Regions:
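Active-site-proximal cap/lid insertion segments
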Residues: 1-28, 32-193, 206-214, 260-265, ...
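A generic structural signal for nonpolar/aromatic side chains embedded in well-ordered alpha-helices
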Residues: 46, 65, 223-224, 251, ...
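C-terminal cap/loop subdomain of S1 sulfatases and analogous C-terminal strand-loop tails that border
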Residues: 27, 151-157, 184, 195-200, ...
Length: 317
């Protein structure tokens, strides 16, 4: 019997263009759907598994990178490590995916990072196959396209791998791209902080629909038209081990990331100035020079935690 650790702690080189993998077939099904529904309104959600572990891609995508030239993150560690000045609760002591229960050497880390990059590039290629079909069918100029990832990915920062077990930028920031014909300026980026729950009300507004009462989130339509438009909402992230209680709750503004562990930060807190410290190397929590910032963000975190606690545990429909 193969253990989860031995199964996950590897990467896969797919044969050919990856035709035997589910993600390739997902793109094929999406293409068939577009062909079958090109003459009527449609909604199509295309979900690719990769680059979830084990990272997988055809050989030519691995060959895009020289493994010896791949840089390690500035805070790389062989195994999950709580840096000095950080609360112990900030990092789960065991990886849940890659390098489970053992150290990752620098060579192994570079090889795994290359595999992740290759897997991401292959996912991008499969996405391109679907978009190319939109062009072929003449649908691009009347189709809204949203590219979104549901979580970030740690690649050896503080010894962490994959998505879970911390609330740092690397694991919580996600890609989000909107293409709205006649609305979005090509190639523009917005510095505003938004949340995944904003996607649904955005699509509803763009389609001229009223979102159901009680739907959380806020339409991003103003930012799609003007990426630098005023925006006063931060993003929140929750770490829960059981789906009922909070291990940690964090808030992200354009400049700051602040996290409290345990009820009202009883197990410690973290504050980072992401403008000056994008890799989150120095914890500014409890620094007197940043007391006002921490106090303001702590109020936001605790209000958010109280609100979602009152709402009860999240459940899948």
């Amino acid at each position: 019997q193969t253990s989860r650790a031995s199964y996950s702690d590897r990467w896969v080189v797919l044969e050919g263009e990856g035709e035997g993998h589910g993600d390739f077939r997902t793109a094929d099904r999406a293409i068939r759907y577009l062909r079958d529904n090109k003459d009527k309104p449609f909604f199509l959600a295309v979900g690719f598994v990769k680059p979830h572990s084990p990272p997988s891609a055809p050989k030519r995508f691995y060959d895009l990178w020289d493994v010896d030239s791949i840089p390690l993150p500035p805070n790389f560690a062989p195994r999950p490590t709580v840096p000095e000045g950080f609360p112990k609760a900030a990092i789960r002591p065991r990886n849940a995916d890659l390098f489970m229960g053992r150290d990752a050497s620098e060579t192994e880390a570079r090889e795994m990072i290359r595999a992740y990059l290759a897997s991401t590039a292959w996912m991008d290629w499969n996405t391109g196959r679907v978009l190319a079909e939109l062009d072929k069918l003449g649908l691009r100029e009347k189709t809204i396209v949203v590219f979104w990832g549901d979580h970030g990915y740690q690649l050896g920062e503080r010894g962490k791998w994959s998505k879970a077990g911390s609330l740092f930028e690397q694991g919580t920031r996600t890609p989000l791209i909107f293409i709205v014909p006649g609305v979005t300026p090509a190639g523009k980026r917005s510095p505003r902080v938004v949340e995944a729950i904003d996607i649904y009300p955005t699509l509803a507004e763009l389609c001229g629909l009223a979102p159901p009462v009680g739907v959380e989130g806020r339409s991003l339509a103003p930012l799609l038209k003007e990426p630098d438009a005023e925006w006063d909402r931060p993003a929140f992230t929750v770490w829960s081990e059981d789906g009922r209680t909070f291990h940690g709750v964090g808030v992200r503004t354009e400049r700051w990331r602040y996290t409290e562990f345990g009820v009202n930060g009883v197990n410690g807190s973290m504050l980072f100035d992401l403008n000056a410290d994008p890799h989150e190397l120095k914890n500014l929590a409890d620094d007197p020079q940043h007391a006002d910032v921490q106090k303001e963000l702590s109020v936001q975190v605790r209000k958010y935690a109280a609100r979602i606690s009152a709402a009860g545990p999240a459940t899948n429909p």
